[in-house]
From Swiss-Prot:
Protein name per UniProt: HTH-type transcriptional regulator EcpR
GO terms of molecular function: DNA binding
Organism superkingdom: Bacteria
Main location: cytoplasm
A GO biological process held by the record: positive regulation of DNA-templated transcription initiation
Family to which the UniProt record says this protein belongs: Belongs to the EcpR/MatA family.
All copies of domain HTH luxR-type, residue ranges: 138-196
PROSITE patterns in alphabetical order: HTH_LUXR_2
Keywords: Activator, Cytoplasm, DNA-binding, Transcription, Transcription regulation
This protein's encoding gene: ecpR
Role of this protein: Part of the ecpRABCDE operon, which encodes the E.coli common pilus (ECP). ECP is found in both commensal and pathogenic strains and plays a dual role in early-stage biofilm development and host cell recognition. Positively regulates the expression of the ecp operon by binding to two TTCCT boxes.
Amino acid sequence: MTWQNDYSRDYEVKNHMECQNRSDKYIWSPHDAYFYKGLSELIVDIDRLIYLSLEKIRKDFVFINLNTDSLTEFINRDNEWLSAVKGKQVVLIAARKSEALANYWYYNSNIRGVVYAGLSRDIRKELAYVINGRFLRKDIKKDKITDREMEIIRMTAQGMLPKSIARIENCSVKTVYTHRRNAEAKLYSKLYKLVQ
């Protein structure tokens, strides 16, 4: 009898999440169907590990997929998307190449936490940990992008050349290349590949 109750509850919860989240777009990007479906199912799956109701999560949270396909958009418009989610509990889901950027935004804005989506991690526990408000600065194990590196990343994403960046930042071209190299090491990729 209890397995039927559990099944019924799970079905009801899953149905609730799928119906309700379409209009509110609490998972970004809603156009990434696999991420959207996978994260919706994960949240339902960890229902017993989280303290908040699914309705509250749907209403108050925004889950953002920071993958290589969406990084350029987030880099170019970080002030816009940060303003758009103001007042919400923002959870960044970071792929390996975006971990340092996720850490930057965590330190420099009002982000609730970061879920690192590496293959060896238990994403269910990490997601519950962040939703429950337990993610703290001490939980960040990886490097974060510095303010200067972020400025150079933004300008590179806009198509600016190192010489122009150096003139704007009032530094040498060599310094621009040093900051780019440092950012690339933290992002595990060349900047031009990430921001195309």
